[in-house]
Amino acid sequence: MGPLSRDAWAQRLGAFRASPSAFMAGPEGEDLGRDLLSDLRSEKLSEQTKVSLLALSMEYPAQLWPDASAAEVAATSLLDTLVLLPPRPSALRRPLLLAATTALAAGGALGPTSGASCRLLPLLLGLAAGSDLGRGFVPASEQRPLQATACECLRELESCKPGLLGGSLGLLRGLLGQEGPVQPLSLLLALALRNTLVLQSRVGAGLGGLLTDKVSPTGGGPWDWTLVEEGDGRLQPQAPSWPAAEEGEGERSLTAREHSPEEARELRAAVIQLLDTSYLLTPVAQAQLLWLLGWALRGLQGQPPALFKPQLVRLLGTAQLTLLHAMLALKAAFGEALFTAQDEALLLRRLTLAAQHPALPPPTHLFYLHCVLSFPENWPLGPEGEEAAPLLLGPQLCRGLLPSLLHDPMALLARLHLLCLLCAEEEEEEKGQLPSPRHYLEELLAGLRQRAALDGGPRALATLCFQASYLVACCLAGQPTVLTPLIHGLAQLYQARPMLAPHFVDLLDQVDSELREPLKVVLRQVVVSRPGRDEALCWHLQMLAKVADGDAQSATLNFLQAAAAHCTNWDLQQGLLRVCRALLRAGVRGGLVDLLQVLARQLEDPDGRDHARLYYILLAHLAAPKLGVALGPSLAAPALASSLVAENQGFVAALMVQEAPALVRLSLGSHRVKGPLPVLKLQPEALEPIYSLELRFRVEGQLYAPLEAVHVPCLCPGRPARPLLLPLQPRCPAPARLDVHALYTTSTGLTCHAHLPPLFVNFADLFLPFPQPPEGAGLGFFEELWDSCLPEGAESRVWCPLGPQGLEGLVSRHLEPFVVVAQPPTSYCVAIHLPPDSKLLLRLEAALADGVPVALRTDDWAVLPLAGDYLRGLAAAV
Amino acid sequence: MFSAGAESLLHQAREIQDEELKKFCSRICKLLQAEDLGPDTLDSLQRLFLIISATKYSRRLEKTCVDLLQATLGLPACPEQLQVLCAAILREMSPSDSLSLAWDHTQNSRQLSLVASVLLAQGDRNEEVRAVGQGVLRALESRQPEGPSLRHLLPVMAKVVVLSPGTLQEDQATLLSKRLVDWLRYASLQQGLPHSGGFFSTPRARQPGPVTEVDGAVATDFFTVLSSGHRFTDDQWLNVQAFSMLRAWLLHSGPEGPGTLDTDDRSEQEGSTLSVISATSSAGRLLPPRERLREVAFEYCQRLIEQSNRRALRKGDSDLQKACLVEAVLVLDVLCRQDPSFLYRSLSCLKALHGRVRGDPASVRVLLPLAHFFLSHGEAAAVDSEAVYQHLFTRIPVEQFHSPMLAFEFIQFCRDNLHLFSGHLSTLRLSFPNLFKFLAWNSPPLTSEFVALLPALVDAGTALEMLHALLDLPCLTAVLDLQLRSAPAASERPLWDTSLRAPSCLEAFRDPQFQGLFQYLLRPKASGATERLAPLHQLLQPMAGCARVAQCAQAVPTLLQAFFSAVTQVADGSLINQLALLLLGRSDSLYPAPGYAAGVHSVLSSQFLALCTLKPSLVVELARDLLEFLGSVNGLCSRASLVTSVVWAIGEYLSVTYDRRCTVEQINKFFEALEALLFEVTQCRPSAALPRCPPQVVTVLMTTLTKLASRSQDLIPRASLLLSKMRTLAHSPATSSTHSEEGAEAIRTRATELLTLLKMPSVAQFVLTPSTEVCSPRYHRDANTALPLALRTVSRLVEREAGLMPG
């Protein structure tokens, strides 16, 4: 494919810039790099186009040449293009140099094995030195710009591979003295010096003659890569910042070796040389230089920081932010060695006053506040990393820096941070005449919350409030006097505006447990205390899913129960189930099972119902550890419980039937006289919920046929149970005692066995009536029975004392069902059937004042004394 | 119904704030306190009445105001108009605790009747009804010289009788009956005198002539409601009022009322000779008062029927004729019920009446009481009244569906007489398409009536057709509208939405190509066949904005609920299958009225589940159709609720526990179909044109797939893969545009849970196919049945650290 036209390239570059990765993934992507390189040599394209092509290659080297080999090829090609340029002024030389450098650096191809590197480095060094490379390579007019560019390129390469220029230090130092671009050279030298110092001291070597050796390394054959290999590329801070990361290691290694006086003198001379010319540099470059030198010299023995003193005089009055920052960096590095207390006070005053300047743009304002907040002190107190306000920053100074609701959010937060630091210090200070910072802080937070609670207020206000709360929680985590009102204030905020729930959830996720746990409790109370239909139900549920745990179960469950009725759509139902899930994971059982069952039956949406049922079944059937596994992978898998084999007291207990105190009471109900057999009516009553109750009865003395056991599925205290009917099959008509045993399961799953107090079957309990004779035939029927008794039976007369109720009352009370013939109030004929096949006939006649004579007959002798006792006892019986 | 002006007045009245009303009341109070009974007061009271009656029950007046109103009502000097207003306001405010109207102090009977009306509106809390009744009776008994008093009191009496039937004692009732006889039968036949106009009235006032019939002829027989004249005397007024209360009184003093003794007496007198001859000849004899009243009432009704034959000169009179006919037939019905001897005397005349009326569309409302008469007495009279019903059910709805009054009466007639229809229920059932016309046109007032009527109409034979008809009800409304619009101008145009013009629809209505479909929709009787009306839905789309159609569409979900609760009582297995199929099939062919589809879908989905609960094997039997339904993915998102239900039912009931015929192949087939559906649902890019797929469809699909996998374990790896894909998908930002954050989280949670469950296949199988008793309330409580308790005990045994239960 021939070279593309200018327009074609413009189109292509436009497409590329719109979405580089998409373009590279597309069909044209492969050829782009190749075409670009080849077209750089094309005659048809103007220089302008070529410059734009080169700009592209500088901006997107990683996309164009993704691996080292491609980068190598590209750099070689670029260098060839450079060499082939005709010896006349051209705008392409500098871009070409830069592009080649970029390709090598970004592609990771820089190294001793790379041909391109070995060509580029000497070329750059030569150009930087301003020496003529022959063949009219550089037109005179381009000499200086190229020199500067070469320096930039070298600096780039040096910062990629620290130590690369270690051998050229002398040469560079020499150049600085001569005519030439000061700024690039100064920066390059400072960087190389810094890197060399650090690397040399790490390996324990001195500078040697590096600073004085003015011979170009290119002259003596291949490039010297030894320092680079030692450095191993680990020394790569890219931006001027507090050199905290490297500090520990750097300091140790820097002090490891002392320089010889010779070396020290040379070094000092070099540094002074650099500093002396530094005023010529732009402020940013100056800051960079100071930072590099500061780091290079920090902790280096024999190199007093007093070297910087002359510069400080200039710097203390600077209005340039970068220079101010550089100075603070020097202060952080050298502390009291360089700065007196007066300096420090002056700096602080400058900072605080500058931070209050009304006309400052917000970023500058924030910068000053940041400087105040992390002010490097001469004598840092307290452990590393602990935040504290600067010591010399008195309350007087701070007064102007207190936050107010009118500040813009970032400034407010920064000032709030300072305020928090002041509050943290406040404890040891006595109460001043000024309102205490803590009080101020509380008012401010309350104001923020008030603004956040405004209905329909912008979200930014709420966000600010939560940011401030978070900040306070972080800074003052250990202070309950601050946290308690904060928590309550937040709870009120939630109450006022539940739609902030997502913010709360976020805050809970972020803060430490010192705030989180109490805040959770309070929020849960707020949510749970307002059950029922609410616009904010979805927020409440979202909140509850976050804060619900094992505590205050019943209130939470009640809330959910009330909410369930209003969860009509799927989203709300899912919210509800999310809360249930949180409870499940917190290990709540009890009422939750009931709730889930209700949900599984009542929710409207089939999916919600199904999901509730799934939770219900899981909760009902799985033991806690397994439930944890089933609900989510985050809980650790339980260790397999292998105690089946272990001897275990409880294990035995659970499998055995245990003797227990009786939890059931039985009472005899009223007598029942229907049916062919006498039936006892028993009224059971439980003291605790019991299940599968089996009552076994044993008759003493074989008087009755063996009795069936009675089963009751479930008995609960306070719930009336149905009476139990126990039919008796007497073998002879006699009272008896029944032994009662109960066997049941408790609600905890144990099987128990208990002796109940014995039951007494009375003589009267066995009475059964004869079938009712037809109307009017009663007397004849009775006479027939009366007569049938005698030959083998017995007859007797008994005096039955009458109580206050008289004969009528007595009969109606005790003998009513058995009366065959009645002539009230004087005469009654009573016929009683006694199972299995005996009868007892009574004639009560002519009652006197205190008793009635009873004539009785029976066909069973044995009954006679029982009947006598019965009759005599009637009056006493109520 | 109201003119725009009246409408705006009502609006104003309703929007008056309490503050304003309070001020207004205090002004009225001032006026009343000053006993200013001039036009100002009149105007203010009129306004107050408007406000009070326009905002029913929500306004309360202050006690002082109420007291003043009462006082004004009691003022002897108060003009009548003010009194009427005061009474009306007090009636509107009832029941009121602070009422202290004294019944005894009022002298004027006019005033008495007003006070009585207020008292009777109180709801008989302090036995007011009885007191008022006795008071009126005293007035009646006192035989005051002449009637203005009675004229006002008789309506009060009528009301008392209805409100509290036991008020009157025997002799009082007899007295009233006697007087009713007098009033009914012996009103004068001369017109009343005009009011004497005072001093300046001309003495040359025309001599009052005799009363006339409606056609202008001089009255030949006794005076009735239908006699006309310029001015009525008081006894004529009483005649009219007596007729008004006649039916209520007859019912009150009927054989089952306090008058039982009388009938017994009479039957003893006449023995069992209930022959036609004896019945006709009994008129002249002296009868007990109640008997006499019946006799007179019968004569009165017959005279009315005869009078209604005459051609009325004025339109008002002709309306009156019809109304009186209705009442007369009803009275006759009551008479015949109380005393069968009237039956034979009235039959011939009623038959003639029916013959006369059936051809006259104007007097169609008379047909209903007539039909009721024949329905209740047809058997006794051995008359074949089939023709009456045929005419009633086939012709009337077709022609008169747009008359709101008739529609309401017609449906109430059906509802009230369901118990009488026993033999003719099939006629009623088969004519449901006709009844639905009433419903379609007048859906708001008739919905509740139909909910009560549907259980009787639903029948296994016509259930499917009826379901179709219910779903097409809004369409039917639209077609009825078209029918009316295209009909030649009727004398009285029914109300329709004049703002809506749909010429294309009208053309389509006349297009012979669609005649068949329109005829089908307008069929008078159930035809047994069903036709796809989808073309009509498209055609009639412009009518969907019509207010009537929208109202009808709102009523349909309620009716569907009622229909299903009725049909599930009679449905057998195959009908359930057919119903389920119909549900699925019709879900995407509904009339496009706004909001209609959503409402219907929610009912259909819950009913589909109800059908599945009734017959779980439905899922296996209809497997092919269900698969087909799930395959047609277009429009799935709009039917989300139905899809959710169907998918859930598949997961729940496609299992061997419910149907032994369920095979692994079937499960696999469903799994594949649902898997494809899930992919289709989640992979489609969000676009403005397509509705978003709700997250519950995704979650229910995932759950169902997991359930199926737990039953056919070969599918577990596939299901796991699918679930983990869904989980990552829910994390990706692409989904967040499709689902809300909560939705995405729900999907994620569900996928995670199901994934972990599938890792424990034994648990999954148990948990995802629970036995039916799981949902019984005692499941986890009862130690006898509770698997949970047993499991918990075992797990406690197995865990050492759980510290076993206390010994």
UniProtKB/Swiss-Prot annotation, chain A:
GO terms for cellular component: AP-5 adaptor complex; AP-type membrane coat adaptor complex; late endosome; lysosomal membrane. InterPro entries: AP5B1, AP5B1_barrel, AP5B1_C, AP5B1_middle, AP5B1_N. GO terms for biological process: endosomal transport; protein transport; vesicle-mediated transport. Residues 234-260 are annotated as: Disordered. It holds the Pfam family AP5B1_middle. Residues 250-260 have a biased composition (Basic and acidic residues). Keywords: Protein transport, Transport. It comes from the Eukaryota. The keyword Phosphoprotein does not apply. As part of AP-5, a probable fifth adaptor protein complex it may be involved in endosomal transport. PANTHER family: AP-5 COMPLEX SUBUNIT BETA-1 (PTHR34033:SF1). Probably part of the adaptor protein complex 5 (AP-5), a tetramer composed of AP5B1, AP5M1, AP5S1 and AP5Z1. Interacts with ZFYVE26 and SPG11. This is AP-5 complex subunit beta-1. It comes from Homo sapiens.
Curated annotation (Swiss-Prot), chain B:
Keywords: Cytoplasm, DNA damage, DNA repair, Hereditary spastic paraplegia, Neurodegeneration, Nucleus, Protein transport, Transport. It holds the Pfam family TPR_AP5Z1_C. It is found in: Cytoplasm; Nucleus. GO terms for biological process: autophagosome assembly; axon development; double-strand break repair via homologous recombination; endosomal transport; gene expression; Golgi organization; intracellular protein transport; late endosome to Golgi transport. Its main location: cytoplasm. It comes from the Eukaryota. One of its GO terms (cellular component) is lysosome. It is linked to Spastic paraplegia 48, autosomal recessive: A form of spastic paraplegia, a neurodegenerative disorder characterized by a slow, gradual, progressive weakness and spasticity of the lower limbs. Rate of progression and the severity of symptoms are quite variable. Initial symptoms may include difficulty with balance, weakness and stiffness in the legs, muscle spasms, and dragging the toes when walking. In some forms of the disorder, bladder symptoms (such as incontinence) may appear, or the weakness and stiffness may spread to other parts of the body. Probably part of the adaptor protein complex 5 (AP-5) a tetramer composed of AP5B1, AP5M1, AP5S1 and AP5Z1. Interacts with ZFYVE26 and SPG11. As part of AP-5, a probable fifth adaptor protein complex it may be involved in endosomal transport. According to PubMed:20613862 it is a putative helicase required for efficient homologous recombination DNA double-strand break repair. This is AP-5 complex subunit zeta-1. It comes from Homo sapiens (Human). The lineage of its organism: Eukaryota, Metazoa, Chordata, Craniata, Vertebrata.
